[in-house]
């Protein structure tokens, strides 16, 4: 049997909002499989915030560069928001992004290309800096949007520039995972369906009735995770699909990056802990 470590319990607690003992019990029952534990906790109603997965932790910036029908979205990280606004850091990030869109290099290739520059910048600024990831979007019509330095979106499709720009803004705010409801993978649909059936049965419904109830819930689920199924943020009474149809536009692809997605930030030390650490030192 796999060992349930304190680190696993801590991660599950952060991702679900459930109590420490509840998390430990769920991990024991799931043989230390954290994803299975979350699924089981959702079924039982124990998870209060399972969507909290991927704590936003690292600082830095998202840079977008477009060239010849290709857009590059680049994430460069640092340790503090102060350095993220430093002119040397922003110039470095812009230089890497320009090289990325020109060559469509992988993140590993960019890291190798700029390692010497990065090391020199780390020595100058005094913080660790990392070229974390890069993604590319190609299309005859591209629209990009950055929310501050922290969120970047590029949308590829057909239509006027203003409409596609508004769609990019919607993606930044609403975080869709797929373009259309039909794009949601079958395994994702089946996994969510199993969770919803069990939730309905836990409400005391016979399985046959529970499965019928789930049809509506699954339609809502695929709509919520897909761009065209979501309520348009600027006109909430209409879906994005309806807006696109009205404007004679379409979306074929999009990429959304947010600084620090999936990076867990070390817990900040309290003042009392700092004092204790100083006394020990």
Swiss-Prot record:
Name of the protein in its database record: Elongation factor Ts
Please name the NCBIfam families in this protein's record: tsf
Q: Name one GO molecular function term.
A: translation elongation factor activity
Q: Which gene encodes it?
A: tsf
Domain of life assignment: Bacteria
Q: Does Protein biosynthesis count among this protein's keywords? A: yes
Region span, Involved in Mg(2+) ion dislocation from EF-Tu: 80-83
**Keyword tags:** Cytoplasm, Elongation factor, Protein biosynthesis
Q: Name one GO cellular component term.
A: cytoplasm
- Keyword Cytoplasm listed? The answer is yes
Q: What does this protein do?
A: Associates with the EF-Tu.GDP complex and induces the exchange of GDP to GTP. It remains bound to the aminoacyl-tRNA.EF-Tu.GTP complex up to the GTP hydrolysis stage on the ribosome.
Note one Pfam family from the annotation: EF_TS
InterPro entries the record matches = EF-Ts_dimer_sf, Transl_elong_EFTs/EF1B, Transl_elong_EFTs/EF1B_dimer, Transl_elong_Ts_CS, UBA-like_sf
Gene3D superfamilies linked: 1.10.286.20, DNA helicase RuvA subunit, C-terminal domain, Elongation factor Ts, dimerisation domain
Q: Where is the protein found, in the record's own terms?
A: Cytoplasm
To which protein family does this belong?
Belongs to the EF-Ts family.
UniProt source species: Aliivibrio fischeri (strain MJ11)
